[in-house]
């Protein structure tokens, strides 16, 4: 069994890829604490067939411990890969962090894909501090809530955001 320490980031690559690149820039910035082990660094998928792409994505999932979904304006309409990635995360029981690119700090029912709206997940705004906080704290909370049989959308309180200076 492989050691799972990666963060798998799913997004609308046509419209929201720059947010993923911003996360990578935060990681490189010496002035932030932000850090994550990117599952997308595991392999490069060159073949453009759907079967080959999904095979490469499955390899990334095998080393993943946390699933992050960047939710933009069009995310809920994406079925070919984003929905498949969400299905994989849920099937594998990964803690899910849903990041609202519009700044909303709770579940955005208009943008969040239906497949994950009622699943156990934390919904946050797009910001390095709250995302780092979620990466560090949500997996343990997720496991506890899972054992308690809880489901549904969770979000951090305003006090949590204030404590982070947000």
Regions found by a protein language model. Give the residues of each.
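Conserved beta-strand-loop-alpha-helix hinge of the TIR/SEFIR fold
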Residues: 60-86, 94-104
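Conserved N-terminal substructure of TIR/SEFIR domains
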Residues: 1-63, 150-166
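Glycine-rich, phosphate-binding/catalytic loops in enzymes
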Residues: 25-27, 84-87
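Anion (oxyanion) recognition and catalysis
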Residues: 90
């Amino acid at each position: 069994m492989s050691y799972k320490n990666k963060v798998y980031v799913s997004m609308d690559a046509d419209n929201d890829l720059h947010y993923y690149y911003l996360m990578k820039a935060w990681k490189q910035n010496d002035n932030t604490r932000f850090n994550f082990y990117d599952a997308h660094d595991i392999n490069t998928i060159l073949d453009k067939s759907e079967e080959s792409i999904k095979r490469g994505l499955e390899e990334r999932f095998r080393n993943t411990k946390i699933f992050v979904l960047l939710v933009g304006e069009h995310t809920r309409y994406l079925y070919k890969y984003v929905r498949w990635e969400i299905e994989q995360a849920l099937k594998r029981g990964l803690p899910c962090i849903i990041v609202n690119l519009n700044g909303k700090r709770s579940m955005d029912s208009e943008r969040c894909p239906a497949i994950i709206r009622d699943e156990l997940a934390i919904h946050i705004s797009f910001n390095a501090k709250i995302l780092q906080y979620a990466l560090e704290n949500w997996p343990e909370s997720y496991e506890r809530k899972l054992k308690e049989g809880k489901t549904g959308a969770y979000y951090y309180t305003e006090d949590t955001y204030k404590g982070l200076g947000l």
